[in-house]
Amino acid sequence: MALLEVKDLRVESKDGTEIVRGASLTVDEGEIVDLIGPNGSGKSTLAKTIVGCSGYEVVEGEVRFKGRDITDLPMYERARMGLTMSWQEPARFEGLTVGEYLSVCTDDEDWARRCLRIVGLDPEEYWDRECGENLSGGERKRVELAAVMAMRPNLVILDEPDAGLDMSSMEDLAKVIETMREEGSAVLLITHNRDLAEQVGDRAYLMMDGKIVDEGDPRDVVLKCLMCGGGLVCGAE
C-alpha cells in the first residue's frame, strides 16, 4: 500500500478555474519522488491540495494517506498524521529565534542543533539569532529545511527547496534530502533543477497543463520534460 495516493484529482481555484486536471500519483514509504514540469503546470497547486491548503476546491478524485481518505481533512489534521510541506517562500517567524522556532518542531535540542549543521548552519552562531529580517533568504530557506527535518514527518513535500540557494549549495541540499529519508521521511520533491532531480529521485512524474503525462526513471522523465520545453535548469549553470 502506498503511503500517499492521489487518484484522478481535479482541483479548481475559488473563481472556478481548473488548475489540476485529473492528476494521479503515488509515493511509497521511504521513497523520494520528483515532480517536475514547466511553470504554471499545476505542481504547486497539487502539492498545496495534498497538504490541505485553503483556496482550492477538489471537484473530483481523492487524496489518501496511510490508507485513509484525507481529501476533506483540514491541514492541521494532516500534519498530525505526519504530512507536511516546506514552502517555496519560507515564513519569516518574526519575534522568534532560530532555536525557539526549531523547539516548536522537536523537543530534542541535540537533534535540532544537528539539523542546523546538516543544512549548513552553525548552531553556535544561529541558535539565538532572530528569524525574519535578521536572516537572508537563503538562511531562512535552510532554517525551514532544518525545521521540517527536525519534525521527522512520514512524508514531506519540498516545493522548490533550491530557491534562494546558490548552486554551490546543491550538493548540501541533496545530502539534506537523503538525511530526511534516513530519518524515516518519504519525500515528494518539486524542482526545476535537473541535476537535483536526477541525483536524489527514485522515480519522477512529469506534469504539464494540470495533468500527469509521464512517470518513470528520473533521467528519462527529465529528458522528456526537456524535449517538451519544460524549463528545467542544470545545476552547474
Predicted regions mapped to residue ranges:
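ABC ATPase C-loop
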Residues: V148-M149
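The feature captures the beta-strand-to-loop junction immediately N-terminal to the Walker
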Residues: I36-P38
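H-loop/switch region of ABC-family ATPase nucleotide-binding domains
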Residues: T191-H192
